[in-house]
Structures are given as C-alpha cells and as structure tokens.
Amino acid sequence: MSNPSSPNPLRVGIGGPVGSGKTALCEMLCKRMRDNYDMAVITNDIYTKEDMEILLRADALPAERLMGVETGGCPHTAIREDASINLEAIARMSADFPDLDLILVESGGDNLAATFSPELSDLTIYVIDVAGGEKIPRKGGPGITRSDLLIINKTDLAPYVGANLDIMAQDAKRMRGERPFVFTNLRSGDGVETVIEYIRKQGLLDEKRKN
C-alpha cells in the first residue's frame, strides 16, 4: 500500500494472469461505484486497446473516462520498471477531470511475478481464478503474497475443474499471512461488495470526498 491519504485520486492497480477476470472486475467496480465516486479507468494491452473497448461496450463509464495504453512490450514493464506511460495517462485523466476520486489501472495479463510500482498504485489488487487449479495460491509470487488484496475469481467453476475452495483458502492464508483475500464470482457479482468495501476503507475514499 502506498499513500491513500494523498489529496490526489486514489490509484488502484489491478493485476493478474490473462483471463483471470481483471476487466470484469473493472466493469463491476465502475457500475457499482460510479454513482458515488468520480472515476476513470486506464487499461494496459500490449498491441491493442481491447480491454478498454470491452469496458466501453459494457457502458462501464463514458468513453472520455476510459483510456487504453498500448505498452508495446512485456506488460509488467509498464507497471513496474518503467511506469512512465501509465503515470502520463493518470496525469492526463487528472487534468481532464480535476475532481477524480478514483482511478483504476488494469495491467496487461501477466504472470505471478508481476507487481505495481509504488509510484503508480496506492492499492494493489491481484486477481487469480479457480480455473487455473487449486494449486495457484500456494505457487506464491509477489502478486499472491504482497498484493494488498487477493481475489480468487470464478468460484462457480470449482466443481468442473476439481478445485477445492477450502484448500485454496488455506493456502492463500498461509502464503499471505494477515493480508486479506476474497472469493468472487464476477459473472454473478458475488463478492464484489466486499472488494468495494475494502477499497473504500483502505483507500480512505470517503475521507477524500470530505476534504
């Protein structure tokens, strides 16, 4: 966690492997938070703006509040080693919308070693999914062990892939210690309110609005 008490918009970095549900999470957060908070989203893709276009088609936010960044290389470079392209996008969004409360920064799909630079993200959320197998939490990696919040998505698929959610919970707790995790089914919305409450409280969103 960086400095959520800053007067600038809260920046929430959302990472995880390809297909884990990062864009679905962005969509759900936008649709459930946009009436109460001034929001924008920045998506990262290597050669396209596909994730931004998905959010646009889903009417997650107005087009001017969605920005797609083409990283042109390894996805984790743009969120860690050289975050300048994303920092520039945040600066542009903040200039266009001076009253922003919250900016979601979705990374391109990456491996378990991907992490956000502290200068880019105040809170980090890492999304994995049950379809990857119940062993995923115990594989570790910075995304699983050091993210502020771990999301284990697609719980509805557990019976079909032979994943035991109790074992995944035990492994997540062992790997993360006191850091929280939550099970979600983003298709149905299960668990989303828990994620929103975490962002609100840990990101001091309501305190920001008072100031």
Swiss-Prot record:
GO terms for molecular function: GTP binding; GTPase activity; nickel cation binding. Coiled coil: none annotated. Keywords: Chaperone, Cytoplasm, GTP-binding, Nickel insertion, Nucleotide-binding. Gene3D superfamilies: P-loop containing nucleotide triphosphate hydrolases. Its main location: cytoplasm. Pfam families: cobW (PF02492). It is found in: Cytoplasm. GTP binds at residues 16-23. CDD domains: UreG. GO terms for biological process: urea catabolic process. One of its GO terms (cellular component) is cytoplasm. Facilitates the functional incorporation of the urease nickel metallocenter. This process requires GTP hydrolysis, probably effectuated by UreG. PANTHER family: UREASE ACCESSORY PROTEIN G. NCBIfam families: ureG. Homodimer. UreD, UreF and UreG form a complex that acts as a GTP-hydrolysis-dependent molecular chaperone, activating the urease apoprotein by helping to assemble the nickel containing metallocenter of UreC. The UreE protein probably delivers the nickel. Belongs to the SIMIBI class G3E GTPase family. UreG subfamily. HAMAP family: UreG. This is Urease accessory protein UreG. The lineage of its organism: Bacteria, Pseudomonadati, Pseudomonadota, Betaproteobacteria, Burkholderiales. The gene is ureG.
